[in-house]
Regions:
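Conserved beta-strand signature within the Rossmann-like core of class I S-adenosyl-L-methionine
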Residues: 123-129
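Conserved SAM/SAH-binding beta-strand->alpha-helix loop
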Residues: 57-59
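Core SAM-dependent methyltransferase catalytic element
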Residues: 169-185
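A short acidic, Gly/Pro-enriched loop at the edge of an enzyme's catalytic core
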Residues: 84-95
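Conserved class I S-adenosyl-L-methionine
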Residues: 25-34
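Conserved alpha-helix/loop element of class I SAM-dependent methyltransferases that forms part
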Residues: 7-26, 41
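Conserved SAM-binding loop of SAM-dependent methyltransferases across substrates and taxa
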Residues: 35-46
Length: 185
C-alpha cells in the first residue's frame, strides 16, 4: 500500500513542491511521511539539506527508512510520532510539508499551531492535497478522515497565525496551500 501511495502521490508532490522555492541547506520536515517519497524529493530540491520525517504509523516509518536507507541518519531522520506533539525544538525548520495527510490529523487547528511552533521565522508550511468536497464519500469509507476544502485549510492557516497564505490549483483536483511564519524584525 505504501509503495502505491508513493506512486500515486508523486505527481501532486512534484507539482506542489515546485511552488515552494526550496533553498539549498534547508532543514525540512515531512509530517505524515508515509512511504518516504516526499523526503527523497525534498533532498533533490535542496543541496546539503537535512530532511526529517514523522509518521504515526510504525509501518510507514519502517518503509520510509527503507526507501531512504542510503542516507538515513546522515541527511534523513525518520521517527514515529504525531502532528499533535512534534518532537522537535521551537523554530527548527525552514519548511514543513504535509502531502495528503491533514485529513487524518486530530484537532487540525491544534496541529497547525504545533507546525507553526517548529517553523523558523520566515519558514513555510506547504499542504498538498487532492481537492475533495467536505461531505465527500471518502469520509464515509475511510475511518478517521475529515475532508477539508482548500479554502477551509487556508482559513485555518490564517487563524493559526500564518501569513501570505495562498491557494495554488492545478486542475482538476490538485491544490497546494502555502502559509508563512512572520519574520521577527
Amino acid at each position: 500500500m505504501l509503495s502505491f501511495m508513493n506512486y500515486t502521490h508523486a505527481p501532486l508532490t512534484n507539482w506542489g513542491l515546485k511552488l515552494v522555492d526550496v533553498q539549498d541547506g534547508w532543514t525540512m520536515l515531512d509530517v505524515g511521511c508515509g512511504g518516504g517519497f516526499t523526503i527523497r524529493r525534498l533532498l533533490k530540491l535542496s543541496k546539503d539539506a537535512q530532511v526529517y520525517g514523522i509518521d504515526i504509523s510504525e509501518e510507514s516509518v519502517v518503509k520510509a527508512r527503507k526507501v531512504n536507507a542510503d542516507i538515513l541518519n546522515k541527511q534523513v531522520f525518520i521517527t514515529q510520532g504525531s502532528a499533535e506533539k512534534l518532537p522537535y525544538g521551537d523554530g527548527k525548520f525552514d519548511l514543513v510539508t504535509a502531502v495528503e495527510t491533514v485529513y487524518f490529523w486530530p484537532n487540525l487547528p491544534g496541529c497547525l499551531q504545533e507546525v507553526r511552533r517548529v517553523l523558523k521565522p520566515g519558514g513555510k508550511f506547504a499542504i498538498l492535497v487532492e481537492v475533495v468536497d467536505s461531505d465527500s464519500k471518502w469520509t464515509n469509507i475511510v475511518e478517521g478522515m475529515t475532508a477539508y476544502t482548500p479554502e477551509q485549510i487556508k482559513t485555518l492557516l490564517d487563524d493559526a497565525g500564518f501569513t501570505q497564505t495562498a491557494i495554488h490549483r492545478k486542475k482538476p483536483t490538485y491544490a497546494t496551500i502555502i502559509g508563512v511564519i512572520p519574520r521577527i524584525y
